[in-house]
């Protein structure tokens, strides 16, 4: 209670401490701020109180703002501090304002009482409360109190509990082992080991040899500086004979070179690269082969999560979408585990050392470019071990990985013939994410189609932004007038057409029907690319139209949506998911515009089933190919239906996170999700 009554204004949380034993460096992540609004300085001290040199960068914490735990001006209260030091010794962070100081020992999950309380609030929900009660019943009060002190960020028990509940059971593994498939491909699992810890080596190999599907081989190429790995494998797994192939390399050829040596040993029908310290689920191979009974996919991938090595629990799941071309160009979301048909490997070759750090990213691109199909197995079957030396714990320590990823994307574009494409790394702290800007050449005419009823000031805001903010100038505006009654709107129409030779106003006489109005207006557009636009929108990002056009020019794309914000700069639209919110709903609504959301999805380009027609660019040829909007959808569902028709024809729907607009739709109205509208859908 003394700690809770502490009158200090400095609140902090030390969320993670990563100690790199090889480089003698320590990285601390957390957050700190003063309740008085004063700036907080950070210093690093050794056990004798001597100040040490360190690198610090601020990290946004929109989650704390979202839960009203800190004020918006404290959004950047997060920090990462990195310094050289002996991981076996004790160090401190010194937090200082003009009025006070707090000296805090560097240890994981070190909180103030209020900091602990606030961290719990950000994780509070019905499931977490249920999990807490179960933990109390199973472990007693004493262990429960100790667990509470460790904080909610310890390992993410909510996911851990879910995963263990749905994990394949021993009886199911036994059944799988007896199942006879019509097609029984040999799976080659290739591993490059390098001074691998015995504990990790055993877990890695055991999760291969205990698979429920038995037609596999494990190919290990060892570039270690000692013969410890070789001795262990031969002593403990010699009985597996040719199923486990081992080669001691005459030198360390680097990650790509060592992996290629392992790939050269493989003679299976499908190949997959497996990291030497990671873990597989025991039904992984079974699920892959089961999928291949339906179709001989050239490439397949699974979901994955992280294995917290300190606490031996699973955390941070990556529930991946089915193959998303734009998402893959924004981040290597596929990663583990990725199976490739041998004929694809024979054609594209193995890893390339010039992409070390993102060698798998480059390899995935080259394989998919040649593949007949990419299949996603929606099960977590791979666990990426997270320990102090891993990239997962301290991304900044391996910045070269991300510049290599940038070059991998650029090489991909060159191979497929996309010219004048610009690839940029996302700014700190979003390492490993990329922004592609596609060329707009030959800069075609874009027709901007705006239905309108009265609301002169609203329409003027929209149109003014098209002329004064937007930088793509080859456009025309077609306004579809529908039953307006205000005199000033007609005066505004006249003024627009006199001042601008690229504005046309046409009149639709019928009652309001969004689909009919847009189908009618489409006939008056001259451009091959049409931006369907609500009158209550406004350009924020000057390159928004160019961003959308660059994507829409790609032959495989049918429609491109934008990132739309409410007036208070929270998200109104960042993609539409069918089945969400009753029938089809906007994702990431109400989060801050800079919030990374889940796996950065609202901040990067990716593919969705649909995007909103409040701001949607379409190829006119594709729009006509599907006969435009279905006019039975008078108000709602028309945009989702249109996008699904595009998808049926094989065209992609792209969400462009960098095409930023305001959409002044009333937040109280929300998306079109009334029972009547769901029934219409």
Label every PLM stretch briefly.
Residues 214, 222-232, 251, 481-492:
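A conserved acidic beta->alpha catalytic loop
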Residues 256, 313-343, 515-516, 579-621:
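A recurrent flexible, glycine/aromatic-enriched loop bordering the glycosyltransferase active site
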Residues 249-266, 508-525:
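Glycine-rich, basic loop-to-helix element that forms the pyrophosphate-binding segment
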Residues 1-135, 139, 180:
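Basic, ligand-binding patches in group-transfer machinery
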Residues 141-207, 414, 418-468:
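N-proximal low-complexity "stem/linker" segments adjacent to membrane-targeting elements
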Residues 279, 283-314, 537-582:
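Conserved donor NDP-sugar-binding/catalytic core segment of glycosyltransferases
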């Amino acid at each position: 209670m003394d700690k809770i009554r502490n009158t200090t204004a400095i609140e902090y949380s030390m969320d993670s401490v990563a100690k790199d034993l090889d480089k003698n460096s320590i990285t601390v992540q957390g957050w700190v701020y003063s309740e008085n609004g004063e700036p907080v300085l950070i210093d690093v001290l050794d056990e004798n109180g001597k100040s040490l040199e360190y690198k610090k960068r601020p990290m946004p914490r929109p989650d704390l703002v979202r839960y009203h735990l800190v004020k918006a001006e404290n959004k950047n209260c997060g920090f990462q501090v990195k310094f050289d030091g002996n991981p076996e010794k004790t160090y401190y962070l010194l937090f200082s304002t003009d009025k006070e100081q707090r000296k805090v020992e560097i240890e994981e999950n070190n909180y103030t009482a209020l900091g602990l309380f606030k961290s719990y609030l950000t994780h509070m929900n019905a499931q977490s409360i249920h999990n807490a009660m179960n933990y109390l019943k199973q472990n007693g009060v004493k262990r429960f109190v100790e667990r509470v002190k460790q904080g909610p960020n310890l390992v993410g028990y909510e996911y851990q509990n879910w995963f263990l509940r749905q994990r394949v059971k021993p009886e199911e593994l036994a059944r799988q082992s007896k199942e006879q498939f019509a097609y029984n491909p040999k799976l080659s699992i290739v591993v490059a080991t390098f001074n691998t810890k015995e504990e990790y080596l055993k877990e890695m190999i055991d999760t291969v040899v205990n698979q429920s599907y038995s037609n596999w081989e494990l190919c290990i190429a060892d570039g270690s500086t000692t013969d410890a790995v070789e001795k262990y494998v031969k002593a403990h797994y010699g009985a597996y004979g040719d199923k486990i192939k081992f080669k001691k390399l005459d030198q360390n050829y680097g990650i790509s070179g060592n992996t290629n040596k392992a790939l050269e040993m493989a003679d299976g029908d499908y190949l997959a690269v497996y990291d030497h310290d990671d873990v597989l689920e025991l039904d992984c191979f079974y699920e892959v082969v089961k999928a291949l009974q339906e179709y001989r996919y050239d490439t397949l991938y699974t979901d994955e999560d992280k294995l917290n090595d300190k606490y031996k629990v699973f955390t941070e799941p990556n529930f991946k979408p089915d193959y998303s071309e734009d998402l893959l160009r924004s981040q290597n979301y596929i990663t583990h585990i990725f199976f490739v048909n041998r004929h694809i490997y024979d054609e594209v070759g193995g890893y390339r050392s010039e992409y070390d750090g993102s060698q798998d990213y480059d390899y995935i691109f080259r394989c998919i470019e040649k593949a007949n199909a990419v299949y996603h197995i929606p099960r977590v079957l791979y666990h990426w071990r997270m320990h102090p030396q891993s990239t997962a714990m301290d991304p900044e320590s391996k910045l070269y990985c991300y510049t290599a990823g940038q070059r991998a994307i650029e090489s991909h574009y060159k191979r497929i013939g996309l010219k004048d494409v610009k690839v940029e790394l996302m700014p700190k702290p979003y390492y490993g994410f990329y922004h592609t800007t596609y060329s707009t050449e030959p800069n075609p005419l874009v027709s901007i189609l705006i239905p309108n009823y009265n609301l002169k000031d609203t329409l003027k805001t929209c149109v003014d932004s098209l002329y004064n903010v937007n930088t793509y100038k080859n456009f025309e505006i077609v306004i579809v007038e529908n039953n307006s009654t205000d005199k000033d709107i007609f005066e505004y129409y006249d003024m627009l057409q006199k001042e601008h030779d690229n504005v046309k106003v046409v009149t639709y006489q019928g009652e309001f029907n969004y689909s009919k109005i847009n189908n009618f207006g489409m006939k008056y557009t001259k451009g091959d690319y049409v931006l369907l636009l609500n009158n209550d929108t406004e350009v924020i990002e000057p390159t928004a139209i160019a961003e959308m056009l660059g994507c829409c020019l790609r032959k495989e794309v049918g429609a491109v949506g934008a990132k739309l914000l409410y007036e208070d700069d929270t998200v109104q639209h960042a993609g539409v998911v069918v089945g969400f919110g009753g029938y089809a709903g906007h994702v990431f609504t109400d989060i801050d515009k800079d919030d990374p959301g889940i796996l950065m999805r609202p901040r990067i380009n990716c593919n969705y089933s649909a995007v909103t027609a409040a701001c949607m660019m379409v190829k006119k040829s594709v729009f006509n190919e599907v006969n435009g909007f279905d006019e039975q959808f008078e108000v709602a569902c028309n945009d989702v239906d249109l996008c699904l028709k595009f998808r049926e024809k094989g065209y992609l729907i792209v969400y462009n996170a960098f095409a930023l607009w305001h959409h002044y739709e009333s937040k109280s109205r929300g998306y079109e999700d009334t029972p009547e509208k769901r029934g219409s859908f």
